[in-house]
Amino acid sequence: MSITGIDSSHVTESQGTLLFNEPLAEYTTWRVGGPAARLYKPANIDDLALFLSRLPFDEPLLWLGLGSNSLIRDGGFSGTVILTQGCLKEMTLLSDNCIRVEAGVSCASMARFSARNNLSGGEFWAGIPGTMGGALRMNAGCHGGETWQSVIEVQTINRRGEIRTRKPEEFEVAYRHVAGLGDEWFISAKLQLSPGNKETSLQLIKDLLAHRAKTQPTNEYNCGSVFRNPPGDFAARLIESCGLKGVSIGGAVVSEKHANFIINHQGTATAANIEALIHLVQTKVREQTSIELIREVHIIGDANVQTR
């Protein structure tokens, strides 16, 4: 079956939902991006495996959770998007201190689930605006916590729909980076946390979210942190020191509240505006400090808007 030959008959035996020419802006926290040629919402992991096994091997694939670490260009994505958020959403307490979580569970939900089960060490996930699949992929963290410090086992799936169980030692884990995944994607993980107190953990989450609201533009469309922190410094400090707070291109604006955030002001920005502002910030910081800011956000898709 060719890529262009994929149609609704492709999911005859599947339980999920296949959409065509689906606008992606509503699936990203920046609220920008053109359409996906196809978007699939799997019913569960087995359904996902079946769907992948029937895809043409050369079909371009994009995995999307909350879309908080992705800039999808205005031309969209000319392949198939696999949506995990709201789909792969199971959380299970396996033992007193071990949780199995699927890739589509939001990090905030995971933080609350662990706290309510009297486990500590996962409160920081409440401050990450993404899914656990994305957190595994980039070793997401904040407030002194990192995702992979709790991982004891992961499940991955490849484009043939084959599922593997893998251990942490099979990966190279670093700051906001995980190597060794190859042509696979995370679909679940077993996480080991420490015994704790529900009330203490829930209060910590409440305090963390209050701090986040005070220091980050949580009431504006954004993707989270745009750049990684360079060794020994902070991206936000460098951007602010270069006088870039409030700088804008179209509806894309460097946040006055936190310089490592670019906001889509009142939903008026295009992906092209945001991408241009990212490059401008990198250029100005490089020129003034000789430091190269590395993007944390992934830029995906076609730059040119196409008629489909």
Curated annotation (Swiss-Prot):
Pathway: Cell wall biogenesis; peptidoglycan biosynthesis. Belongs to the MurB family. The keyword Isomerase does not apply. Residues 32-196 form the FAD-binding PCMH-type domain. GO terms for molecular function: FAD binding; UDP-N-acetylmuramate dehydrogenase activity. Pfam families: FAD_binding_4, MurB_C. It comes from Legionella pneumophila (strain Lens). Its main location: cytoplasm. PANTHER family: UDP-N-ACETYLENOLPYRUVOYLGLUCOSAMINE REDUCTASE. Its cofactor is FAD. This is UDP-N-acetylenolpyruvoylglucosamine reductase. Cell wall formation. Keywords: Cell cycle, Cell division, Cell shape, Cell wall biogenesis/degradation, Cytoplasm, FAD, Flavoprotein, NADP, Oxidoreductase, Peptidoglycan synthesis. The active site is at 176, 225 (proton donor), 296. It catalyses: UDP-N-acetyl-alpha-D-muramate + NADP(+) = UDP-N-acetyl-3-O-(1-carboxyvinyl)-alpha-D-glucosamine + NADPH + H(+). GO terms for cellular component: cytosol. Its EC number is 1.3.1.98. One of its GO terms (biological process) is peptidoglycan biosynthetic process. It is found in: Cytoplasm.
